[in-house]
Structure formats: C-alpha cells, structure tokens
C-alpha cells in the first residue's frame, strides 16, 4: 500500500455585483468652528444623496460617521511661530448594486473640494459567492482525484482511494480583470465636478483548494 498526498485546486470567475466606496469629507481651517462648518455642510449633502440612492435601490447598504475635529501645528518658515491648524472630518461608506449610479455619484462629489473618494472595493452578492465557493470546492476535489490517479498510474499502482481530506486556510474572493480599486479609484475623485465617472466592474475570482490523502 502506497500513500499519495496531493493538493487539488480550482477557480471560478463571475462579474462583480457589489461596489463599496468610502467618501471622506475633510476641511482645514484656522478655527475649529470654520473647519466643522465646512465639513458639516459637505457631509450632510453626501448623507442626503446616499439616503436617496438607497431609497432608489442603487445602494444596498450604507452608514455615516459623525464629524469630528483634530488639530496639529504646521511649520510655516524659519524663525516664525508654528501655525495651529484644525481639521474636521467625516465619512460615508456605501455599497452599490448599480455601477452607473456609483459613477454618477463620484462625478457629483468632484464638484465639492471637501470630498475625497477612497478606493472602490468590488465583491459578489453573498448568494453568488456561496454558490461559486461550493462549486469550486467540488472541482478542487475532482482535481485532486485526477492528480492522484495520474501518480498511481505512473507508479503502476491500483486505483487510489481517499483516506483523508484537509482544507487549507481559505483564500478570499479577489478582483480579476478590469475590477478597479485602491489608488486608481482614488484618482477618480479628481474628475470634473458633475461629470459621471466610467467604472468597469470586471470579474471576481473565487478560489478553492483541498489537500487529499489517498492509498493505492
């Protein structure tokens, strides 16, 4: 009896169905009230728009942080007293199901200097990810069987039988192809105010791996 240890792998792809983005409203001023006033107005506009998009079905879920103020001292020149700067900040995070609506929203935000758009995180709907993960695991086991059969045949052994199955640490679903995020998405925030930003969702790859022991 010979033991055969193999690793089976599989990967499936599907078009991204969700896009999560965080909009930061941030402003600096010489007085805390001035910084807070600018951010409060900008943040309220972002919240109002997110609420409207959610009511229209373009946003699946969203949440908003409260505005807060911090301060730091800024160097302004040799021999000059440091300048005290106050920074107000707040954020809205939304998960979109409508990519066109997200592009339009980013374009709208570009008209206000207080807004900064973070990276876009693409993902699948929970049901889709569960379905693809299940199928990928099936294919990973089939891959392991095929590998074991190849080794058994090459070594002139009998048909291999499974004795143990172990799942390694799972790999999260990851963007593939044209999905955008990170620094690229941050640059989208600098688009001309009011002009919709073209976004391409691309695909998400769901992977599965399994370690299988056989005897032949």
Predicted regions and their residues:
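Short, charge-dense linear interaction motifs
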Residues: 1-216
């Amino acid at each position: 009896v010979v033991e055969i240890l193999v690793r089976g792998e599989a990967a499936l792809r599907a078009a991204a169905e969700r896009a999560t983005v965080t909009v930061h409203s941030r402003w600096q001023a010489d007085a805390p009230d001035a910084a807070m006033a600018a951010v409060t107005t900008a943040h309220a506009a972002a919240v109002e728009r997110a609420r409207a998009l959610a009511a229209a079905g373009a946003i699946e879920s969203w949440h908003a942080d409260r505005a807060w103020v911090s301060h730091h001292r800024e160097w302004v020149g040799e021999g000059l007293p440091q300048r005290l700067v106050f920074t107000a900040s707040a954020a809205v995070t939304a998960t979109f199901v409508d990519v066109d609506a997200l592009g339009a929203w980013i374009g709208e935000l570009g008209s206000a200097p207080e807004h900064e758009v973070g990276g876009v995180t693409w993902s699948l709907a929970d049901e889709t990810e569960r379905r693809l993960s299940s199928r990928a695991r099936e294919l990973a086991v089939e891959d392991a069987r095929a590998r074991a059969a190849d080794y058994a045949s090459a070594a002139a052994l009998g048909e291999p039988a499974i004795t143990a199955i172990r799942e390694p640490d799972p790999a999260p679903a990851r963007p593939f192809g044209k999905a955008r995020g990170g620094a690229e998405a941050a640059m989208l925030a600098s688009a001309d105010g009011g002009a919709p930003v073209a976004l391409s969702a691309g695909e998400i790859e769901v992977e599965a791996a399994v370690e299988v022991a056989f005897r032949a």
